[in-house]
Amino acid sequence: MNHHQQQQHQKPGEQQLSEPEDMEMEAGDADDPPRITQNPVINGNVAMADGHNNTEEDMEDDTSWRSEATFQFTVERFNRLSESVLSPPCFVRNLPWKIMVMPRLYPDRPHQKSVGFFLQCNAESDSTSWSCHAQAVLKIINYKDDEKSFSRRISHLFFHKENDWGFSNFMAWSEVTDPEKGFIEEDKVTFEVYVQADAPHGVAWDSKKHTGYVGLKNQGATCYMNSLLQTLFFTNQLRKAVYMMPTEGDDSSKSVPLALQRVFYELQHSDKPVGTKKLTKSFGWETLDSFMQHDVQELCRVLLDNVENKMKGTCVEGTIPKLFRGKMVSYIQCKHVDYRSERIEDYYDIQLSIKGKKNIFESFIDYVAVEQLDGDNKYDAGEHGLQEAEKGVKFLTLPPVLHLQLMRFMYDPQTDQNIKINDRFEFPEQLPLDEFLQKTDPKDPANYILHAVLVHSGDNHGGHYVVYLNPKGDGKWCKFDDDVVSRCTKEEAIEHNYGGHDDDLSVRHCTNAYMLVYIRESKLSEVLQPVTDHDIPQQLVERLQEEKRIEAQKRKERQEAHLYMQVQIVAEDQFCGHQGNDMYDEEKVKYTVFKVLKNSTLTEFVQNLSQTMGFPQDQIRLWPMQARSNGTKRPAMLDNEADGNKTMIELSDNENPWTIFLETVDPEMAATGATLPKFDKDHDVMLFLKMYDPKTRSLNYCGHIYTPISCKIRDLLPVMCERAGFPQETNLILYEEVKPNLTERIQDYDVSLDKALDELMDGDIIVFQKDDPENDSSELPTAKEYFRDLYSRVDVIFCDKTIPNDPGFVVTLSNRMNYFQVAKTVAQRLNTDPMLLQFFKSQGYRDGPGNPLRHNYEGTLRDLLQFFKPRQPKKLYYQQLKMKITDFENRRSFKCTWLNSQFREEEITVYPDKHGCVRDLLEECKKVVELSEKGSGKLRLLEIVSYKIIGVHQEDELLECLSPATSRTFRIEEIPLAQVDIDKENEMLITVAHFHKEVFGTFGIPFLLRIHQGGHFREVMKRIQTMLDIQEKEFEKFKFAIVMMGRHTYLNEDEYEVNLKDFEPQPGNMSHPRPWLGLDHFNKAPKDRYTYLEKAYKIHN
């Protein structure tokens, strides 16, 4: 019977029971229902915490938080059991655990009956966010002989949808009820469960209370970063040094040392999980960087390197090397001559191979194993020539803190991807390493104590990361699982993370250690010295506490934001200099902002405003800015007396922020006690005055006036002349600024305001100008034309198409401009000729250049920008040309690669005549590339697909026949002198390409090679070696094959003589590619280590 196979399944065909009352039998349901007896908890190994927040006595009193327990459940009258029954709860990790027992019948096998035995967790909870991983032993007690008790193991992640786990067919009913077997006595059966649970997630788990430590928040797939940070935090000597780094002048958002100080300080003092977003932000990473899963060694090195550099020149300089640096010597010793090469190197961690190794000792033995250099692999000993030698490394020193990287993740060349090795690999709590040192010190043996075990669960594509730490080096272990910290046993921390799969243990084989941290026993007290508040500089404490205070204040403001509103006060001086519609530009105006309780009254606000602005209440008047139906925004009357008791939110009509124009007396008159003139809201009107100057094409603000509604326009002319500084007899032309693009001239000056102005209201604007015939010669002679031109103005961002992410520059244009007017304006900005510019539309669906504009485009700028949304930035692209646009538009942009004389490819763009041929393309190419001094001076165009040359294009071939595609590239190269003239009878140009094992896996730079009928292949090989500049030792590893129709035939280099027919298409298959010569060798070019979603770790600050 395969117990483990069954344990992975819930009760097949049965509904999951979540409400205990549904499973209990009520009195009357049966004549004599089975009675249930709960035995007390047999044992519970309560996990003690040594943190300062609690004592061991406290933990012993509160057994509900324990990590493991054994409890029993006795069912009497067992033979009458017909329904599922549940035991009373036993609390582990403060969650209720119950034994569930049921009879199990099989419809297709009526004579077979079994006992269902399950462990249930937290089934009565309404929460859907909790989870708890546990291992358990389910046992039916044998009354006669406890050793014959029947048990099975389970391992499961309990959560709201799978809150019970066990076996539908735990034992045959007949076996349990057979008195001879010993499982039943007096019709009673006792069920027992031993459960060992991890700390739960999604419930009120107080890590500080139970362990004395806090975790780190999971801020979005930061992988092992949390595990690494906890490991570094508990390297106490490092933590002390980090605190001592001077960061007083550092930018709080960019300083890595300050961010690390902040995380360490909060881990030491906080009662709740600590966030890491400020730390990753200080690295200068994009959001994507937090999700990139690379090895922990890389992150550890760049982080410690960054901190080490920041420590230079400070009192803690050298701390990182002192803690983590060791030295090793790499040597090569010749066997038969007196020659030895040595190089001493520093290391900060050791990468240990685990594949095929039983334990850490075997890995160290493999690390220092001597490699024999003999045969084809002899060592070049200079004047001694090639010699047999021994190559290896020896450790000179081992650091106080030893980081061991276990190579769980490795590249598999067969699958061309990284894989995870889940093999069992053992490591001890105490690690003696003297045998691996070149020279030992009897007074200080290299004995190490295990301090941290970093663990990964899952495969190469993802998973979960935790770290087990021995914080004080005393064998009391804790498990740090992101935000949850819990006590754990030594076995959980060490043995359970060996990996592999042991049928006797319920440990998933994909859960195993990938990094170990050992501390030298002689340095244990020094490295783990207690870190107290006295070790933290006072100025750092004050800075971090001030940050906390500010964050708390901002948090409080966010929480109370719904109680407040903003009132934006705009003063009259903000109207001066405004050159547009209405009184001011909302995007440029400087407001005085007040934070006001929504339920406060207008009277209270006016009192506060008066005190803040320094004017008595009779020297100020409030005019809320009111949006009109025509799209303008003008001041409107607010009656302080009538509306004084109304709330601000009521008066603002829920507008937030609420903008108010604050009218005050002239500051020069304020000291004399002058007050604002009275305003009769029923008979008076407030008007604003602007003066337009056609010569400067500008507006001048001339203040505001109160005037009776019955006043005639002519009565206002003297006031306007005075405000503008004109003589009183000056003739004026008047306009009403109604709305954008609508400015009406006032014709009759002898009518009242209500008849002269359209729908007279407070805040109406009159624009006036001199009636001067000289204005007719101005570009914009009247205010009406000025506002019309203003309405057509648009800010356009011009970005250089050739510069990625170019922010560009802004030019204010009229959307009535034609192509040449736009080009002329932009050319002035760039200090170039308009004819040397080409413009491109912006793509509508994404931010980027679209189709080019022809220089004879007949539309206006408005036509080009019509698809932009009203508030969307208007953007066009340009590129500067080396020829006039009229000539350029008749050419074609042709991207290709150029193979230079050093056999290196570079991307170029040439511009041949679009109606030309390949010859024109090659001639244009000669203008932009550098040819060899002693070369042929002749070029050719090759077409390349999948790193293979598939053809040479003839010079008279039309360019329009060369269609670009992502799967093909074009390459231009200078024809070698040896290939200019080919004897077609006896010679041929063949394609040569590189591949490794599979002919479809081509790579590198393909090339053409001249071969001669009957020539020895060794001579061909020699020419290839010279062309590729490959050392003899490396070239010996190459294999050569003729590849035809996807199949390759390896050549015997010593016997093969060149036969041109081997490289000709087969008869009847002329449409297929010609056979080509393949070079089979390993691709040593650096393969992109990261996919398009990945980048190498780099801390930018």
Swiss-Prot record:
The active site is at C223, H464. SUPFAM superfamilies: Cysteine proteinases (SSF54001), TRAF domain-like (SSF49599). Residues 1-64 are annotated as: Disordered. The keyword Ubl conjugation applies. Residues 70-205 are annotated as: Necessary for nuclear localization. One of its GO terms (cellular component) is cytosol. Its EC number is 3.4.19.12. InterPro entries: MATH/TRAF_dom (IPR002083), Papain-like_cys_pep_sf (IPR038765), Peptidase_C19 (IPR050164), Peptidase_C19_UCH (IPR001394), TRAF-like (IPR008974), USP7_ICP0-binding_dom (IPR024729), USP_C (IPR029346), USP_CS (IPR018200). This is Ubiquitin carboxyl-terminal hydrolase 7. It comes from Gallus gallus (Chicken).
